[in-house]
A protein has these predicted regions:
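Short, Gly/Pro- and small/polar-rich lid/capping loops
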Residues: 1-10
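Glycine-rich, charged/polar anion/phosphate-binding loops
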Residues: 12-16, 187-190
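M16 family metallopeptidases and their MPP-like homologs
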Residues: 15-17, 23-43, 60-116, 153-175, ...
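Active-site SXXK
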Residues: 43-51
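Non-catalytic alpha-helical coupling and interface elements of nucleotide-dependent molecular machines
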Residues: 51, 72, 116-119, 123, ...
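Short, polar/flexible loop-turn hinges at active-site or ligand-entry regions and domain interfaces
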Residues: 53-56, 97-101, 120-129
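Acidic/histidine-enriched alpha-helical segments
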Residues: 64, 120-144
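Scaffold signal of the M16-like zinc-metallopeptidase fold and its non-catalytic homologs
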Residues: 141-197
Length: 204
């Protein structure tokens, strides 16, 4: 296995991890944002909204059809805490080019798809689709309630919130149910402008 960090352009770095043992390639875009109470819930929704549709694929079915044409590529999104930062991660996984018959690189097509979803979102006049926002807010609330119902996870989260009361790290990574309900995530915020530099891309 080999690793290499490459400066792709100003403010963007790529981490390339090469390992012939794996049959798939994953491309991840990682955005580090300041962890703040006033927008933790809104930020947490962003990767899920962005990977559910795009300007070129305005519906979930259209996006799924595109993924099926890429040999069943898979999109994933997550929100984590990393110190006093909120980490938003969006990933696409595809079969490695070694195992395809297409003349055009499958990894290249997958990278372009993910880039399009992130930087050319399904937004009109600066606002996301209302249906997309409602759906992801509902899923986020279900996720938060699920963690509350899971005693070990709830106890761990409560311990962290008490230990780090005076620090941003004490905030829940996705906010609370009340925060999600009140969030104004309908407004599109260009991640490249609000995240800490550098934007980190991981290719494995």
């Amino acid at each position: 296995m080999s690793e290499k960090i490459v400066k792709l352009k100003e403010g963007i770095e790529g981490l390339f991890i090469k390992n012939q043992r794996f049959n798939t390639t994953s491309i991840s875009f990682n955005f580090y944002l300041p962890l703040k109470k006033e927008n933790v819930a809104e930020n947490a929704l962003l990767p899920f909204i962005l990977t559910s549709s795009g300007k070129d694929y305005p519906s979930f079915s259209a996006l799924n059809f595109k993924l099926s044409k890429l040999y069943g590529a898979r999109l994933d999104a997550s929100t984590e805490k990393y110190g006093d930062c909120q980490l938003l991660r969006m990933t696409i996984s595809v079969i490695d080019d070694r195992f395809t018959f297409d003349s055009d690189s499958l990894v290249k097509q997958a990278s372009e798809l993910l880039l399009g979803l992130i930087f050319n979102p399904n937004a009109e006049n600066g606002e996301f689709s209302e249906n997309d926002v409602k759906r992801e807010k509902r899923k986020a609330i279900e996720h938060i309630k699920g963690e509350i119902a899971e005693k070990r996870i709830y106890a761990k989260n409560r311990l962290i919130s008490e230990m780090y009361k005076a620090s941003p790290y004490g905030l829940p990574k996705c906010g609370t149910v009340e925060m999600v309900e009140k969030s104004q995530a309908k407004v599109f915020m260009p991640l490249g402008k609000i995240c800490y530099p550098p934007l980190f891309c991981v290719f494995t």
